[in-house]
Structures are given as C-alpha cells and as structure tokens.
C-alpha cells in the first residue's frame, strides 16, 4: 500500500458530525524554522469545552489511520488570529512529515 501524504491530498474543508466537533478547517502553511511543509487542521467545537474525549476517541485515531506517514507533534489552544468564519472556540492539531 502506498503511504499517504498531506501533500498528495489537497483538502480545503472537512466536516465531522458529532456532539462536540462541528468541523475541521485545514490550512496549509510553511513554518519559518523549517524547509518542509506543515499542515494545520483547525478543530472547531460547539461550546467552550474542548471535548478531549472526542479528540482521543475519534479524531486522533482517524488521522493516525489515514495519514500513516504523519504524526501529531504539537497541540495548542488558539486564542487569536483565528481563521476567517471559524467559531470562537477551537484547538489546532499540527502535522508534519516524520521522515
């Protein structure tokens, strides 16, 4: 099986239905400190709580399964500079190639 890469699949919008997650907003960018591409996935929630259980149960295993050559290297809260038309409460999962 050929390994998947974020560079091969240019998604602009992914919707996930659930009690906590309202949508995913992938935003490609290049980190200043590195010469390899990064890919941000903005995870939006319907309320002020971040629903870590939903992330651990559904989202993270999903990306580990679909993006076997990628890995999560950071997980931070986003409070400013949010994407246009995105809900207030959101976290961000950042992926980069592990090669």
Curated annotation (Swiss-Prot):
Q: Which InterPro entries match?
A: DUF468 (IPR007414)
Q: Which domain of life is it from?
A: Eukaryota
Under Pfam families, the record lists:
DUF468
Family statement drawn from the similarity comment of this UniProt entry:
Belongs to the UPF0320 family.
Protein name from the UniProt record: UPF0320 protein YER188C-A
Q: From what organism does this protein derive?
A: Saccharomyces cerevisiae (strain ATCC 204508 / S288c)
């Amino acid at each position: 099986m050929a390994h998947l890469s974020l560079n091969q699949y240019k998604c602009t919008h992914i919707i996930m239905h659930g009690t906590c997650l309202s949508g995913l907003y992938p935003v490609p960018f290049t980190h200043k400190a590195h010469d390899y591409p990064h890919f941000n996935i903005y995870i939006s929630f319907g309320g002020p709580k971040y629903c870590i259980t939903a992330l651990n149960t559904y989202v993270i295993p999903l990306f580990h399964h679909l993006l076997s050559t990628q890995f999560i290297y950071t997980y931070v809260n986003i409070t400013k500079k949010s994407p246009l038309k995105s809900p207030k409460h959101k976290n961000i999962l950042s992926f980069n190639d592990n090669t």
